[in-house]
Amino acid sequence: MQNLLSIITFLPLAAAAVLAVVSRGSGPAADRNAKWVALTATVVTFLVSLLLLAGFDPANPGMQFVEDRAWIMGLHYKLGVDGISILFVMLTTFLMPLTIASAWHVETRVKEYMIAFLVLEALMIGVFVALDLVLFYLFFEAGLIPMFLIIGIWGGKERIYAAFKFFLYTFLGSVLMLVAMVAMYMMAGTTDIVTLMSFDFPHADLPFLGWWTLTGGVQTLLFLAFFASFAVKMPMWPVHTWLPDAHVQAPTAGSVVLAAVLLKMGGYGFLRFSLPMFPVGAETMTTFVFILSAVAIVYTSLVALAQEDMKKLIAYSSVAHMGYVTMGIFAANQQGVDGAIFQMLSHGFISGALFLCVGVIYDRMHTREIAAYGGLVNRMPAYALIFMFFTMANVGLPGTSGFVGEFLTLLGIFQVNTWVALFATSGVILSAAYALWLYRRVVFGELVKESLKTISDMTTREKAIFAPLVAMTLLLGVYPSLVTDLIGPSVAHLVQNYHADLGTLAQATAGN
């Protein structure tokens, strides 16, 4: 089917335009119509993306469904997917209908709320399918705007502060990437991402001030420029401080999208740009990345143990889990990269579900303070069961997708650096500590607080939202080859080219 990627990318945008231009009036009927238009658009987008998945050839590691048209000023509108990017497209289209359904109770500026999420979906998909530097940057940066509005308009009491902190961190982190893109165009004469993957950027060591030499030279500088953007987006320690504030102030649906998809743009960027385009720079900075990741895993896990706000605890948990992802990516072997991608997919399901779990009781009690709860199992048995399932999955219980991602990632890291891997393994114990501590305080114990004695269990709508997330977490936990077979050839191609480039450069250096 021609133009399938364009259809998937811009279908939510078309629905947003319909809501903005056609939808008139206000009141309950207009709000209900806006919700149904948004839900229908996201469901249709997911169904169309299934056609993409059905027609995808996993054995082909190259780009598929490529669309390439001349655009402006010599630039090209070019889209395509490989085994890595198609997974993130599917994650996005799978989660968005659930996100819209979780926002069914919203009553303030409903039409605008739905438009913001539809625009955000289109921009997120665009990031994963763009094959032109400028197009990628436009999608990558434009995605800040709807998320900024979602936090700033529909967020909590400190929403303005959190929205601006989110915007400034992520925007300023991308400034260096823009400068690097201009430099890449001047050196390579193209903005085509596939072409740039095979371009040999200068890598000779650069002397500074006569006493210090930058290994990898220009490649390392380009790597660091992209690293600044992707590290903030993931986020990595110590540029993670915007995330807890953003999660705490964002509405539930905003937290789901932020944790499940937006953070993955950083990991995707490392896979699409950092490793294939700047192998010498990546190799030079690998130890640095390992150290930051290991510190993130342990430090943010310890910080999570001290939290009294449920959303903030889960936010710090996300930073710790992304530490495993960056370790796996920069291990640069099949198991490590497979595990990192699997971990990102799994984290999308599990973290999204955990934020939904917080949203369920927040809608009833209007507080996220852990101390305000206790004994919920006595009034909300279905909620207690679902919350326990995703708590165990977040810890990495065998049989869930959380276990597979962590196991593969650690397996890959052990092959590269045993000490770092052992240090990172301690994070598994810490994650069990904070996750079970949260669950015990919220769900177990006596139901002594009067305000909780009339709380109702989950509705049918809420259970229906969780059902697909439970199914995917279990399915990928017992049958992980559904993912590894899809991404395997593309990951193998990435890893082989990375090491081949390093080997070729090493031989050239030795010859000189």
Curated annotation (Swiss-Prot):
* Keyword Membrane annotated: yes
Name the residues that span the membrane: 3-23, 36-56, 84-104, 112-132, 133-153, 166-186, 208-228, 251-271, 285-305, 313-333, 341-361, 384-404, 419-439, 464-484
EC numbers, comma separated: 7.1.1.-
Q: How does it sit in the membrane?
A: Multi-pass membrane protein
Which Pfam families has this protein been placed in?
Answer: Proton_antipo_M
Q: GO molecular-function annotation terms?
A: NADH dehydrogenase (ubiquinone) activity; ubiquinone binding
Q: According to the lineage, what is the superkingdom?
A: Bacteria
An example Gene Ontology biological process: electron transport coupled proton transport
Question: Quick one: a GO cellular component term?
Answer: plasma membrane
Write down the chemical reaction(s) this protein catalyses.
Answer: a quinone + NADH + 5 H(+)(in) = a quinol + NAD(+) + 4 H(+)(out)
> Which InterPro entries does the entry mention?
NADH_Q_OxRdtase_chainM/4, NADH_UbQ_OxRdtase, ND/Mrp_TM
Location of the protein in the cell: Cell membrane
Keyword list, A-Z: Cell membrane, Membrane, NAD, Quinone, Translocase, Transmembrane, Transmembrane helix, Ubiquinone
List each coiled-coil range: none
Give the record's family classification: Belongs to the complex I subunit 4 family.
Role this protein plays: NDH-1 shuttles electrons from NADH, via FMN and iron-sulfur (Fe-S) centers, to quinones in the respiratory chain. The immediate electron acceptor for the enzyme in this species is believed to be ubiquinone. Couples the redox reaction to proton translocation (for every two electrons transferred, four hydrogen ions are translocated across the cytoplasmic membrane), and thus conserves the redox energy in a proton gradient.
Name recorded for this polypeptide: NADH-quinone oxidoreductase subunit M
Record the organism. Rhodobacter capsulatus
Q: What's the gene?
A: nuoM
